[in-house]
């Protein structure tokens, strides 16, 4: 099952995506600038193999719902996201507001 829903954080538009898979759930909250995602995100791949794309992204681990993703600290962020003030430990919602 997959759901794609519009959501607003402090009045700013984002898209929340939930993909239920066997034994795991993929979670993403995005806008036109970047996204935060569950632990399935391979930040190292984005930094090393896709560095030329300057992808703004961060991952939070151990989250099982969109709300948990918003409330969790980011465990790792892409190099490109640092220019937006993102860093490990930044709360997901706060990171999204920095790109809104």
Q: Where are the model-predicted features located?
A:
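Residues that scaffold, gate, or flank divalent-cation-dependent active/transport sites
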Residues: 2-100
